[in-house]
Amino acid sequence: MINLILIRHGQSQWNLENRFTGWYDAELTEKGIEEAKKAGLLIKELGLSFNFGFSSFQQRAIKTLENILLTSELKIPNIIKAWQLNERHYGALQGLNKSETAKKHGDKQVMIWRRSYDTPPPPQDKNDPNHPSNLDIYKNIDSKLIPDSESLKDTYNRTIPYYLDNIEPLLKKSENIIISAHGNSLRALCKKIFEISDAMIVELEIPTGNPIHVVFDNKLNILDYKYLDSTRAKNFIIKK
């Protein structure tokens, strides 16, 4: 059997403040750190070993994986950070309070930006100092690849080629893997892995800091999947 752990980072400061976070590098809150540590204990109970751990470039995902390793006592020899696993870029909405934005633009418009599959928010100004093209961490990435705004579809088109080229081949070699990422990059991965339709994927809610354990056979057919913390589990939507 082959094991894949998918985990959304623990609660971040901007999650707590109900802001659109996107590519902003928000830190974990104390609650978020504790969520990550608890996730590590849950993973430890599985009694598995992992050779690869993946995270995005963003600190909330990196620190979540670090805290998982701390409490699980896992020794993962290969830790890989990939910007392709970053959160969806929320464009000009980044940093705005979600409730206040709904009051300004209307609930319907904000829900289209947040939950439609293929409608991105207005783009972030390239002159914004927080635009990723102006940050040192992304200086070695082709500027043409750096988004100003993304829909969930755009996030899927960024994340899944990386998964197919770099993660799926490892699974096919029977490597156990942990991926620490974000709500929307994990939606993209779940859409691919579970073959969820465009219409249904927008309804998938993934809680912070709760590991999803997926078990495959050697042909990557899914044998089982579940949240390790059943008290905070969200229902999977596995529909075509």
Language model: regions and residue ranges:
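Loop-to-helix element that buttresses phosphate recognition and phosphoryl-transfer chemistry
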Residues: 11-67, 71, 146-163, 203
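Short, hydrophobic/glycine-enriched beta-strand segments
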Residues: 3-9, 179
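Short active-site segment of divalent metal-dependent hydrolases/proteases
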Residues: 12, 185-186
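Acidic, low-complexity terminal tails and accessory targeting/binding regions
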Residues: 2-3, 39, 85-100, 148, ...
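Active-site glycine-centered loops adjacent to acidic/histidine catalytic or metal-binding residues
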Residues: 9, 84, 182
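Short beta-strand scaffold positions
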Residues: 55-56, 179-181
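Internal catalytic-core helix/loop-beta-alpha segment
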Residues: 112-116, 121-123, 135, 141-161
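Phosphate-coordination/substrate-recognition cap region in phosphate-metabolizing enzymes
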Residues: 39-132, 138, 191-215, 222
